[in-house]
UniProtKB/Swiss-Prot annotation:
Chain's gene name: sspB
Molecular function terms from GO: double-stranded DNA binding
Record's keyword annotation contains Acetylation: no
Extra information: SASP are degraded in the first minutes of spore germination and provide amino acids for both new protein synthesis and metabolism.
Disulfide linkage: none
Biological processes, Gene Ontology terms: DNA topological change; sporulation resulting in formation of a cellular spore
Endpoints of the signal sequence: none
Name of this protein: Small, acid-soluble spore protein B
Site (Cleavage): E25, I26
Function statement: SASP are bound to spore DNA. They are double-stranded DNA-binding proteins that cause DNA to change to an a-like conformation. They protect the DNA backbone from chemical and enzymatic cleavage and are thus involved in dormant spore's high resistance to UV light.
Keyword Nucleus applies: no
Keywords carried by this UniProt record: DNA-binding, Sporulation
A Pfam family that the UniProt record links to this protein: SASP
């Protein structure tokens, strides 16, 4: 059977908990109550901020150089 990878598979064990914690912290900072009753815009703002912070963290780890 072929090895099937999904782009949603986490490569680092324990990353899911760290990302969930980040999501809760950002939602709190933004005053967003995550859930089904929250607008897509509000929930999306949290996801967008997570992406910005993860990219920033990766850039810092790489010392600003692109590989």
């Amino acid at each position: 059977m072929a090895n099937q990878n999904s782009s949603n598979d986490l490569l680092v064990p324990g990353a899911a908990q760290a990302i969930d914690q980040m999501k809760l912290e950002i939602a709190s900072e933004f005053g967003v109550n995550l859930g089904a009753d929250t607008t897509s815009r509000a929930n999306g703002s949290v996801g967008g901020e997570i992406t910005k912070r993860l990219v920033s963290f990766a850039q810092q780890q790489m010392g600003g150089r692109v590989q």
